A protein has these predicted regions:
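Phosphate/diphosphate ligand-binding glycine-rich loop within oxidoreductases
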Residues: 61-63, 67-140
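Amphipathic, non-transmembrane alpha-helical secondary structure
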Residues: 12, 16-19, 79, 83, ...
């Protein structure tokens, strides 16, 4: 049996749900969710991707802050900005766009983000919970979470089935395997 998954229709549905949830948070609790997207360097694809994320968040009513740094930014400078964002009560989530310039250690940068604000779910605490199969409310990388959401929306149950995951990256393949 073949199931055609309409990603665009599902994205439209999820965007509408998200926009409504954000509006309710603002109306009932005076809360406006906030995300900071941090980018270092001038990688064209990364600039487009982060701009699109920033614009989408704004359309959904989310406070989005785009922090751009030159390619020669020092690790200390970027860590100082992450520390500010960690302590900023208007920012609920932090995303550091990869790839980073070569002088920056992605592991050090990722580990500096508070686990609760780690959009990509790459902080060791979040990864540990995921790989230990702990249930709870902690960040998991967006792509694997989105894949599982798509399957659930179309009532596709993988229990007892064989599935192939191509790739074993820490951002997609490994988290998807754990989900």
């Amino acid at each position: 049996m073949t199931t055609i998954i309409d990603g665009k229709a599902l994205a439209k549905k999820i965007n509408a749900q998200t926009k409504e949830l954000v509006a309710q948070l603002k109306e009932k609790q005076n809360i406006i969710p906030g995300i900071a997207v941090v980018i270092a360097g001038d990688d064209a694809a990364s600039l487009i991707y982060t701009r699109n994320k920033h614009n989408k968040a704004i359309k959904l009513g989310i406070n989005s802050v785009l922090k751009k740094f030159p390619a020669d930014v020092s690790q200390d400078e970027l860590l100082a900005e992450i520390e500010k964002l960690n302590n900023d009560d208007t920012i609920d989530a932090i995303l550091v766009q990869q790839p980073l310039p070569p002088q920056l250690d992605p592991e050090v940068i990722t580990n500096a983000i508070l686990p609760a604000k780690d959009v990509d779910g790459l902080n060791p605490l979040n990864l540990g919970k995921l790989f230990a199969n702990q249930h709870g409310n902690y960040p998991v990388a967006c792509t694997p979470r989105g894949i599982m959401r798509m399957l659930a929306e179309y009532n596709i149950d993988l229990q007892g089935k064989n599935a192939v995951i191509v790739g074993r990256s820490i951002l997609v393949g490994k988290p998807l395997l754990a989900l």
